[in-house]
Regions:
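Surface-exposed loop/turn motifs in large extracellular/passenger domains
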Residues: 1-30, 37-63, 67-94, 98-119, ...
Length: 161
């Protein structure tokens, strides 16, 4: 999916409750504010969103100035990933592979294999939240993070030239 506000699975604005069991996702999301699975914005007083992924295979790519491959931006989100195989790559100024660079929440990863990579600005992270980390049990995490303070999303560079 692509656009100014691009989200493949979830809610553009507000609460989301996503449950995936035994599911295979292949998602490519590009935009100004983008996500693969989750929510892009909160409503005032909204309930924390929930994402529960189990027994699933995910192959996710996110390219946006801000967003999250799995998670919510600008809103609280509680995420549980179990017995799953996830490959995720993100690029942007304030992006997260799994979790949120701009929101709050909790993240539990158990019995899973996660391969995460990113080329991003200083306000980005591979796995977790800016305000706290996550809990990982009996899982393999392979993370490759290139954090560059001068990173600019490629489309912005093309517009400037």
């Amino acid at each position: 999916c692509s656009g100014n506000n691009a989200l493949a699975v979830g809610s553009l604005c507000g609460y989301t409750d996503i449950k995936a069991d035994g599911t295979t996702f292949l998602i490519r999301s590009l935009g100004e504010r983008a996500g693969c699975i989750g929510s892009l914005a909160a409503l005032d007083g909204s309930t924390p969103s929930r994402i529960n992924i189990k027994n699933s295979t995910l192959d996710l790519l996110l390219k946006a100035p801000c967003g999250s491959a799995v998670g919510c931006r600008k809103t609280a989100c509680d995420t549980v990933i179990s017995d799953s195989d996830i490959t995720v790559h993100v690029e942007g100024d304030a992006v997260a592979g799994i979790g949120s660079a701009e929101g709050k929440g909790s993240l539990l990863i158990k019995n899973s294999d996660i391969k995460s990579s990113s080329s991003s600005g200083i306000y980005s992270l591979d796995i977790g939240f800016m305000n706290k980390g996550c809990i990982i049990n009996n899982s393999t995490i392979n993370s490759h993070l290139i954090n560059d303070p001068d990173y600019h999303e490629p489309s912005r560079l093309m517009q400037q030239n």
